[in-house]
Amino acid sequence: MAKVLVLYYSMYGHIETMAHAIAEGANKVDGVEVVIKRVPETMNAEAFLKAGGKTQNAPQATPQELADYDAIIFGTPTRFGNMSGQMRTFLDQTGGLWATGALYGKLASVFSSTGTGGGQEQTITSTWTTLAHHGMVIVPIGYGAQELFDVSAVRGGTPYGATTIAGGDGSRQPSQEELAIARFQGEHVAGLAKKLNG
C-alpha cells in the first residue's frame, strides 16, 4: 500500500484547511494510506498567540519519518516569496536523509497560501529546489483541475500547485474553488504514488 504524507505549517489556519482538502482528495484513491502531520512551531507559545497564531490539531512530524512515505505533499505559507521559517527549519534537519538518499525517487508536491497573491508561485518553485537536492520527483498539477480555468473571481491556484489567497489581514478563507484544486492535487499525487508503489 502506498503511503502519502501531507506535511504542513500553518500559522493562521489557511494552510491547515488546504491540507485537509489535499488529504480528502488523496483519500479518494483506493489502496493509499494518507497521513496529515505538521512541522513544529519555532516561535515560543506566547509570541505565537500574540501574533494571532491558531492552535493546530495535527500531530508533529519528525524529519526522520519522511523516509517512511512514498509521496509527501508539502504545505507552507508564503514568506517574502519563500517557504515559512518553520518549514525551512524542518527541512534543514533532513541532511541525514540526504546523505543516505532516503528520499531519492519519492514523489513531492507543494501547496501554498499568500496574503495578496504575491509570491505564491515563487514559494512553490523555491521549495522545489530543496526537494530536488533530495532527488525527489516533483509533481506539479498542470491544468488538470478545471477550476484553474475559471477567471470569474479572484482565487489562488497555479499549475505548480494549489494555493489560496488569505487577504492582507488573513480574513479571507480558502474558497470552494481553491479547495477543489487542493483536492485535485491530493488525488493526483496519491494516484501516481499508487501506480509507482501500489
UniProtKB/Swiss-Prot annotation:
Gene3D superfamilies: 3.40.50.360. Its EC number is 1.6.5.2. The keyword Cell membrane does not apply. NAD(+) binds at Y12. One of its GO terms (molecular function) is NAD binding. Keywords: Flavoprotein, FMN, NAD, NADP, Nucleotide-binding, Oxidoreductase. Binds 1 FMN per monomer. PROSITE patterns: FLAVODOXIN_LIKE (PS50902). Residues 4-189 form the Flavodoxin-like domain. It catalyses: a quinone + NADH + H(+) = a quinol + NAD(+); a quinone + NADPH + H(+) = a quinol + NADP(+). InterPro entries: Flavodoxin/NO_synth, Flavoprotein-like_sf, Flavoprotein_WrbA-like, FMN_Rdtase-like_dom, NQO. The keyword NAD applies. It comes from the Bacteria. Substrate binds at W98. GO terms for cellular component: membrane. It is an enzyme of class 1 (oxidoreductase). Its cofactor is FMN. FMN binds at residues 10-15, 78-80, 113-118, 133. Belongs to the WrbA family. This is NAD(P)H dehydrogenase (quinone).
